[in-house]
């Protein structure tokens, strides 16, 4: 697969989700995203009130809910996400109950997903995170099918904060197979180089979450 630097930039979510990030870090991220041509930044919900400059510049603002462990009640996640949208978020990445994902409990997953989707009407882009590093292939497929049924826009591999690791080519391939092109697949967690990003796209990722957007794009072939 041949992918250009501009095409890669267009599918990156430039991520800043560490617990110690500051408003100055956010402003630097905004500057870098604009310079690199990356259209989306992903930031903590508590920083949504500092995104006016990014919104005015045309950046899409993504945030997270139930992050990073997914153990909030679904209605709490929904409220967190809805508040972020009121502050200007156009995309929300929600961590599912990972125990339910691992158990392939489609009823529990669908109930959670529907509650959150109902709180975030279109055109808000909704992504569900499954922590693929700790989930087997069958459970990944079940979660993806539930996400499709619930009206999600993306299934996402990882928070990037789980000690088991982040995205793998193998997990992306499973998610993409289950998604069947009906929803997107976001690969996130540990993607630091151009080669890694290309491998994820080749496996079926349609979005890449990374805090290393500059390094990835600077690694593009001349």
Curated annotation (Swiss-Prot):
It is found in: Cytoplasm. It is an enzyme of class 4 (lyase). One of its GO terms (molecular function) is deoxyribose-phosphate aldolase activity. Its EC number is 4.1.2.4. Its main location: cytoplasm. Belongs to the DeoC/FbaB aldolase family. DeoC type 1 subfamily. Catalyzes a reversible aldol reaction between acetaldehyde and D-glyceraldehyde 3-phosphate to generate 2-deoxy-D-ribose 5-phosphate. NCBIfam families: deoC. This is Deoxyribose-phosphate aldolase. It comes from Corynebacterium efficiens (strain DSM 44549 / YS-314 / AJ 12310 / JCM 11189 / NBRC 100395). The gene is deoC.
């Amino acid at each position: 697969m041949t992918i250009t630097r501009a095409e890669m930039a267009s599918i990156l979510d430039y991520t800043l989700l560490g617990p110690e990030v500051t408003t100055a870090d956010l402003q630097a991220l905004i500057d870098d995203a604009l310079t690199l041509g990356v259209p989306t930044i992903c930031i903590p919900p508590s920083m949504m009130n500092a995104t006016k400059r990014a919104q005015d510049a045309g950046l899409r603002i993504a945030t997270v809910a139930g992050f990073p462990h997914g153990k909030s009640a679904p209605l709490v996640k929904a409220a967190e996400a809805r508040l972020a949208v009121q502050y200007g978020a156009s995309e929300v990445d929600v961590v599912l109950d990972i125990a339910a994902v691992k158990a392939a409990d489609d009823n529990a997953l669908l109930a959670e997903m529907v509650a959150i989707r109902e709180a975030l009407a279109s055109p808000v882009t909704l992504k569900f995170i499954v922590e693929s590093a700790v989930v087997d292939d069958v459970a990944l497929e079940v979660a993806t099918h539930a996400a499709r049924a619930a009206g999600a826009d993306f299934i996402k591999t990882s928070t990037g904060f789980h000690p088991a690791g982040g995205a793998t080519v193998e997990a992306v391939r499973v998610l993409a197979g289950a998604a069947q092109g009906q929803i997107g697949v976001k690969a996130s967690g540990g993607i630091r180089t151009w080669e890694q990003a290309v491998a994820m796209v080749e496996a079926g990722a349609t979005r890449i979450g990374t805090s290393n957007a500059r390094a990835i794009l600077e690694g593009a072939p001349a």
